């Protein structure tokens, strides 16, 4: 993922992301929660789709099972992340609708 994508999903600026990364600073609770949600969803996608690059490609494309929405864009809220994770679990069980 690009720094721009990560920063947008975490709700922080790219410069803030780079500073936090360089100084290994502790993130505030809300940003930490968003980072956990992002990491968890990416891990599930990689597990289900069995390929890191394929998982990132899937997360960046409109998905019919999400009403044509882009999974990464849904990860800004917990409700959106839940929708993405539910679809990934459905795919894992062979139910892609």
What do these predicted ranges mean?
Residues 1-97:
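Non-transmembrane "mature" sequence context
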